[in-house]
C-alpha cells in the first residue's frame, strides 16, 4: 500500500475543517434570517379595519361601535393643524353607528358623499336636518347614541349617576372653544347658586354693567325734599324753596341676576343626601321639598 505523505494528511484535515466552518456559517445565516423575518405587515399596507362600514370602529375595551367623521375644513383644538375628528357617539349595534356616520356625512358634505346605505333611506332625515346647524345636529346624534345615557330613564336629560346610583339632570349644547363652554357654565352656576358659586372667571364680568351704573348714578344724586310753606303770609320774605339732604351712607347695591338662556351648556349633578349641605350642594333643593320621599325609593330599589 502506498504510504500517504504527511502533506496529504494535512490537506485532508484542512478540507474537513473548512467544510465544518462553511456549514456552521450557513446554519447561522439561516437562523439570523428567520429571526429577522417581519411578522407585522409593512407600513405601506392598508390597516385592518374593525368594521366593514365607513366611519365605524369597534372599541377594544367596551365592545361598542363608535362613529367618527373627519372634518378636513376645521382646525383642531390646539389650532396647530387643519382637520379634526368629530365624535358621533357610541352604539351597541354596528348598523346604528354606520347610519349615524351617514347622517353626519350628509350634513357636512351633501348628497354626493359616499354612504354606507342607500341615499333614499335618509329622505326624512335630510328634511329634518335642514333647519339645524352642524353643531346642533351632531349634538342630537350624540344624544341618540347608546353611550349618552349611563342609566335607564324614560325622561329626557335624566341619567343614573355611576358613583352613588342616584339620578342626575343634564342640559347642554356644543361650543366651539373651551372658553365659551366655561362662560356658559359660569352663567348657569351664578343663576342657580348665587354669587358665591365657584366660577372659571371673575364673577364681576357677569354682572350687568349698565344696570350697576344706573344704580350708582341714582345713589350719587342728592335727594330733594318737598318745599315747605312759610308760616307767615308776608310775600316779601323769600321762603326756602327746597332743602338738599345728602345721604350719610349709600344704600347697598343688590346685583341683578341674569336670565339663564335655554341653550346654555351646564351640568347639574345630584349629590348624596347623607352629606352636609354646602354652597356647592344640589341646586334642586327647592324642588326636593315638593317630592314625596317614596319618589326616590322607587328609583333606588329599581333595576
Swiss-Prot record:
SMART domains: AP2 (SM00380). Its main location: nucleus. Keywords: Activator, DNA-binding, Ethylene signaling pathway, Nucleus, Repeat, Transcription, Transcription regulation. The keyword Nucleus applies. It is found in: Nucleus. InterPro entries: AP2/ERF_dom, AP2/ERF_dom_sf, DNA-bd_dom_sf. Residues 20-32 have a biased composition (Polar residues). This is AP2-like ethylene-responsive transcription factor At1g79700. It comes from Arabidopsis thaliana.
Amino acid at each position: 500500500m502506498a504510504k500517504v505523505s504527511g502533506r496529504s494528511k494535512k490537506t485532508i484535515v484542512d478540507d474537513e475543517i473548512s467544510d465544518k466552518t462553511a456549514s456552521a456559517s450557513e446554519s447561522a445565516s439561516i437562523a439570523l434570517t428567520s429571526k429577522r423575518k417581519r411578522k407585522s405587515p409593512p407600513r405601506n399596507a392598508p390597516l385592518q379595519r374593525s368594521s366593514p362600514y365607513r366611519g365605524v370602529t369597534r372599541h377594544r375595551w367596551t365592545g361598542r361601535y363608535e362613529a367618527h367623521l373627519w372634518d378636513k375644513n376645521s382646525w383642531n383644538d390646539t389650532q396647530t393643524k387643519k382637520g379634526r375628528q368629530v365624535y358621533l357617539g357610541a352604539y351597541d349595534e354596528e348598523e346604528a353607528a354606520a347610519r349615524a356616520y351617514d347622517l353626519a356625512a350628509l350634513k357636512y358634505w351633501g348628497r354626493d358623499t359616499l354612504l354606507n346605505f342607500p341615499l333614499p333611506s335618509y329622505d326624512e332625515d335630510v328634511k329634518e336636518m335642514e333647519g339645524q346647524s352642524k353643531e346642533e345636529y351632531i349634538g342630537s346624534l350624540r344624544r341618540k347614541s347608546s353611550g349618552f345615557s349611563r342609566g335607564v330613564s324614560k325622561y329626557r336629560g335624566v341619567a343614573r349617576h355611576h358613583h352613588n346610583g342616584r339620578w342626575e339632570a343634564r342640559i347642554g349644547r356644543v361650543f366651539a372653544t373651551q372658553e365659551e363652554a366655561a362662560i356658559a357654565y359660569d352663567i348657569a352656576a351664578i343663576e342657580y347658586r348665587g354669587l358665591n358659586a365657584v366660577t372659571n372667571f371673575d364673577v364681576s364680568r357677569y354682572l350687568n354693567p349698565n344696570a350697576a351704573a344706573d344704580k350708582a348714578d341714582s345713589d350719587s344724586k342728592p335727594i330733594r325734599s318737598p318745599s315747605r310753606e312759610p308760616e307767615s303770609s308776608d310775600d316779601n320774605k323769600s321762603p326756602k324753596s327746597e332743602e338738599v339732604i345728602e345721604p350719610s351712607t349709600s344704600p347697598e347695591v343688590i346685583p341683578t341676576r341674569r336670565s339663564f338662556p335655554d341653550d346654555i351648556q351646564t351640568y347639574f349633578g345630584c349629590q348624596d343626601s347623607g352629606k352636609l349641605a354646602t354652597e356647592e350642594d344640589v341646586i334642586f333643593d327647592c324642588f326636593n321639598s315638593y317630592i314625596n320621599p317614596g319618589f326616590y325609593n322607587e328609583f333606588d330599589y329599581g333595576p
